[in-house]
Amino acid sequence: MLRLLAIETSCDETAVAVVEADAAWPTFAPRQLSSVVASQIDLHAAYGGVVPEVAARRHVETLPFVLESALQQAGLGMAEVDAVAVTCAPGLVGSLLVGLMAAKTLALLYNKPLIGVHHLEGHLFSGFLAAADLRPPCLGLLVSGGHTSLIWMKDYGEYQTMGRTRDDAAGEAFDKVARLLGLGYPGGPQIDRWAQQGDPDRFPLPEGKLDHPYDTSFSGLKTAVLRLVQQLQQEGQELPVADIAASFQACLTRVLTEKAVACAEALGLSTLLVTGGVAANRELRARLLEAGRQKGLRVVIPPPNLCTDNAAMIGAAGLCHWLRGETSPLELGVASRLTLEEIPALYGQGSGGCGQAPTGAAAAVF
């Protein structure tokens, strides 16, 4: 049994988790022993969005307590943990550095391997926590505040981006439209809540047609909502917030569903994995599950607490790399941008003297 401590501080959640998996391959079924998340939503709400410097400072203040809580919940000490995983890219540089410095310190103090993890790969691995029988190949629809991508997971650690946003990410579009409607931050849950009471067919909105079949563009949709709001205000009408929210949400979720299903079919894949904060949206989940039922496509959507940023998903990805004999050097840095295809750059000679491959059953794989 391998146990791993994971740290996630890429944006405005301070998260630590302990996960474990059997030292067997390729049967990979990670389990979380603990997962603690300290959110900064209330802190940033006054600014209408995440302030990087404020986020980094709060991580510094909060991380020691979150770390202690995660270990207590797991009933383990650092001596009983086999490795330390940490998000190192992409994200806010200041926030990433807080988590990375903590992870390096623990790795050095307790002589543990260090495993850097790509944040988006972590989101994909939330699916393996939610469905123990999930195996690649599969298509990942990753929808969050900063990313909207269709990712072909060919194998563990082997990815090809099939589609991406040309402008606003889905979560970013939710936040901006919520701001236009005066609904506050974060916008996703607000739009979701108001849309339940609205008519999704009242306002036809543009879907943003592109020449690339799997890319998305939501800037036109956002602008259409802006013009609609301005027109209604100029006419002296009270804003039908619920109907606008429902119309916007229906348009965006329809686009995501159609592109994801079309891509999965084109690749001949039988499983669609949906992750990221926007995957917590009720209408998106319902549309995707219904589309999967109609097309004979298995749709795996983790529970909402695994869709939003958390450290358990980072730990799951870290365990996979650890089982594959991949660790990071202690010189590992952070990056605000890094594609999934660049993930191999995170693993080199290993974390000094403590970056050794697993023994026993896991070692036999390599």
Curated annotation (Swiss-Prot):
An individual GO BP term: tRNA threonylcarbamoyladenosine modification
EC number(s) stated in the UniProt entry for this protein: 2.3.1.234
InterPro entries reported in the protein's UniProt record: ATPase_NBD (IPR043129), Gcp-like_dom (IPR000905), KAE1/TsaD (IPR017861), Peptidase_M22_CS (IPR017860), TsaD (IPR022450)
Any GO MF annotation of the entry: iron ion binding
Gene3D superfamilies: 3.30.420.40
Broad EC category: transferase
Superkingdom in the source lineage: Bacteria
Pfam family, one: TsaD
Binding site for substrate: 142-146, 175, 188, 192, 281
Cofactor: Fe(2+)
Summary of the function given for this chain in its UniProt record: Required for the formation of a threonylcarbamoyl group on adenosine at position 37 (t(6)A37) in tRNAs that read codons beginning with adenine. Is involved in the transfer of the threonylcarbamoyl moiety of threonylcarbamoyl-AMP (TC-AMP) to the N6 group of A37, together with TsaE and TsaB. TsaD likely plays a direct catalytic role in this reaction.
Family as reported in the entry's similarity comment: Belongs to the KAE1 / TsaD family.
Protein name: tRNA N6-adenosine threonylcarbamoyltransferase
Organism of origin: Synechococcus sp. (strain JA-3-3Ab) (Cyanobacteria bacterium Yellowstone A-Prime)
Biological classification of the source: Bacteria, Bacillati, Cyanobacteriota, Cyanophyceae, Synechococcales
Gene coding for it: tsaD
